[in-house]
Structure formats: structure tokens, C-alpha cells
Amino acid sequence: EEVISRLKQENAEIIFVNQEQSEIPGTFWRFLVIDDESVDKFMIRDADSLISYKEKAAVKEWLNSGKYFHVMRDSRMHNELILAGMWGGYNGVIKNMFGLMKDYLKEDMDVNRISDQVFLRKRIWKTVIQSVLVHDSYHLGKEGKPYPDYEISDIEKIAFFHIGMIDSNSCTIKTEIEIKAKKVKWYLENENGEIICSYDSFIKKENGKQIIEINLPTFYSSKIKSNKWKISYEVLE
């Protein structure tokens, strides 16, 4: 509910799946945009992936290419034909995506964390390959081409940067809570005292101390380590 509330504050459109749609695995729900007749073009991304100038340049090149679909691979770990959170296309080419997903799941009952990508390989790639721009840093397939030049941001200078990276996995900040509590609202403040973000967290016990663990993007955590930014909090429970 908190996430939905935050999205609404940023004027995001929230679409709830219906009862029938909710019966397929949640990782497949994002593909339902392909059945939305109000959508002209779609880009499907993981909710926790980092948006970058490199991705922006790649998408711009796709939009100017005349191709119906766009696929990106940017890591040695990106070894599927279509990464479930790194592709896009024009609507109207793939028909009845929900039906395709239901039929596939009836045949393949072994649902796991990569089932969505296996579905894309087995059922969708044969359509996508007919008109696709593939950006591929490691040339998984002959259809891949290099990424265009792009503006370099600070985050794109780190050694492990790639499109689709989950940047908040790279650093966990532990903050001691000195007041006895069960739950706090913490704030990330910059050098000017401005609030960058704020979330609720439950207290954990570690070595006799009360702490909260916060996963932050590399850029944010580096600011804390250099004592330029700080974490403050208020007790909720």
C-alpha cells in the first residue's frame, strides 16, 4: 500500500490485475501491457533496475530504427535471447498475450524465477526476431550490435555498471537506533538537509544493539560513507 501511494503521488497509472489474470505468476503480469489497446509502445523493466543514460541512448536508437522490437543485453550474465526486464516493442504485433501465457503455463507447470524468460524464448522470440534492434555488449547472437555513445553519469563510471543492474544490492547501510523501538521511519538527508527519500523499517537486533538495515544505491551510500549525507529517523512503534 505504501508503494502504491508513493506511485500515485508521482502521477503513475496503477492497473490492478483481475481475478483471472491474478492466477498466473506475478512475474508474467508485466507482459499484460501488450494486450492494452491504449498503449502504442511499451518498455518492460524490472522495478529494481537502474535507469541510465546508456539505456536512454539505446532506446532512442531503437525508436529511430523502424524496428518493431528492442532487446538489450549488457552483462555476461545476460545469456537469454530476451531478458524479461530489458525489452520493449510496439503494440499490435503480438496478439492475445494473456492467452499465450495461459497456454504456455498449462504445458510447463515447473514455474520458477526464470519462467518468464523461458516463456519469452519459447513463445515470443520467433515473432520478435523478425523485426528487432538488439543491443548486446557481449554478442550473444549474430543479431546484436554495439550500444550507441551516451553521456556518462557518476553511477555509470563504476566498474560493475550495466543496464538492468540492481544497484541497491551493492551496499547495505546499518544504522543503530538508540531509542527502544520496534519500527522507525528513516530519512536520507543530503548536505543541505533536504530529504532524498524516506521509508519505514522494522528494528533488528545485532550484537546487543538495535539496528536497521538499509539497501541504498552506490551513489547514495558513498555520500553517507564520506559523511556528506546522513540517516535520521523517528520512532513509529
Regions found by a protein language model. Name each.
Residues 47-49:
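Short acidic donor-binding/metal-coordinating loop in glycosyltransferase active sites
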Residues 33, 69-71, 86-88, 119:
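Conserved hydrophobic/aromatic beta-strand scaffold that supports enzyme active sites
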Residues 39, 66-67, 181:
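Short, high-confidence coil segments that cap the C-terminus of an alpha-helix
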Residues 51-82:
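Conserved donor-nucleotide/metal-binding helix-loop-beta segment in metal-dependent transferases, i.e.
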Residues 27, 31, 56, 116-118:
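Conserved glycosyltransferase catalytic-site signature
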Residues 76-79, 89-231:
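Catalytic core and acceptor-binding pocket of nucleotide-sugar-dependent glycosyltransferases
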Residues 2-41:
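Active-site-proximal specificity loops/subdomain of glycosyltransferases
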